[in-house]
Amino acid sequence: MDSPCQPQPLSQALPQLPGSSSEPLEPEPGRARMGVESYLPCPLLPSYHCPGVPSEASAGSGTPRATATSTTASPLRDGFGGQDGGELRPLQSEGAAALVTKGCQRLAAQGARPEAPKRKWAEDGGDAPSPSKRPWARQENQEAEREGGMSCSCSSGSGEASAGLMEEALPSAPERLALDYIVPCMRYYGICVKDSFLGAALGGRVLAEVEALKRGGRLRDGQLVSQRAIPPRSIRGDQIAWVEGHEPGCRSIGALMAHVDAVIRHCAGRLGSYVINGRTKAMVACYPGNGLGYVRHVDNPHGDGRCITCIYYLNQNWDVKVHGGLLQIFPEGRPVVANIEPLFDRLLIFWSDRRNPHEVKPAYATRYAITVWYFDAKERAAAKDKYQLASGQKGVQVPVSQPPTPT
């Protein structure tokens, strides 16, 4: 990448943005698309993805993947991107790519606790950090790392050594990930993407367990909460199984859920007025690759208690141009589409309510994902009496995993 003012090469692979001289790729006026493509893994920076569109807008096609990336200067560090005036610009770093509205540079540059907007931080009762506290300040020399889990301190090396370092650093890593990355991203954008969440070793074991569930015939066609008059296969084409994580052959899935629980637990009290006291079982989902997807929908349109959606992807060597299966999110009130590729070891987090209508485009290869929804205590209690909940939600609330008691 040459400079923040000339974002290369990611911008060349993305559709033209509003106000550009080229003809827009979207059929509808006022629509831009936002891609998260061709990441270079980096444990130092969050995988921000910062979009939004009106919920009534229709879906577009997938965004082309970038064919090259750069390991030179990061515009995240150079303060490129943000929101001011509504002009969309691409933002890329080692491990993070987004399109955000021009301005709000310090948020993108500093990750958590941005200096701007200062009024927001004053309302939250906190002060902006000094530049020395930026996430990369103490670890700039580790940019060349290509492996790493949730821990920012994992050095490169063998898979076993990296996994050991990740597990050793877990007590502090979830808190850092939550406070520095997820909380600010969710506050400002309502969507957060984190690559290399578990690391290749544990992620591979989770994938093996999911494949075993499919081979064993454990997956069943996904059901609908409502719209019973419409054939389910015309709306959603996935096969699912609900897993708690302690079943035989599901130990690694349980470890994944414990990792996600740890991160969400550290977000508690920092994501609006939500009181998160539990979650669903893990929904293991497989699109068999026969051209089926999931039409645009909202996870929680009627207040059933779900407030946060977390999706973990398990698809190695996935090419959305060949395999399809793109997840598109249409954040409410902003004329852009978030294109999320279902890449291996990627964690996606977004609000479950009407703020984030989304759909899965037709998949032409086997596509795996694990989804869990976290409950807001008050809304969930009211929903139990008001609604007939789906079989995957009713009576399966699982307490958020607690850290082990020190011995």
Swiss-Prot record:
Binding site for Fe cation: 297, 299, 358
Entry note: cofactor: Binds 1 Fe(2+) ion per subunit.
Reported modifications of this chain: Ubiquitinated by SIAH1 and/or SIAH2 in response to the unfolded protein response (UPR), leading to its degradation.
GO cellular component annotations of the record: cytoplasm; nucleoplasm; nucleus
Disulfide bridge partners, by residue number: none
Record keywords: Dioxygenase, Iron, Metal-binding, Nucleus, Oxidoreductase, Phosphoprotein, Ubl conjugation, Vitamin C
Pfam families given in the database record: 2OG-FeII_Oxy_3 (PF13640)
Chain residues that bind 2-oxoglutarate: 367
Phosphoserine PTM positions: 130
Protein name: Prolyl hydroxylase EGLN2
Organism: Homo sapiens
Lineage: Eukaryota, Metazoa, Chordata, Craniata, Vertebrata
Gene symbol of the encoding locus: EGLN2
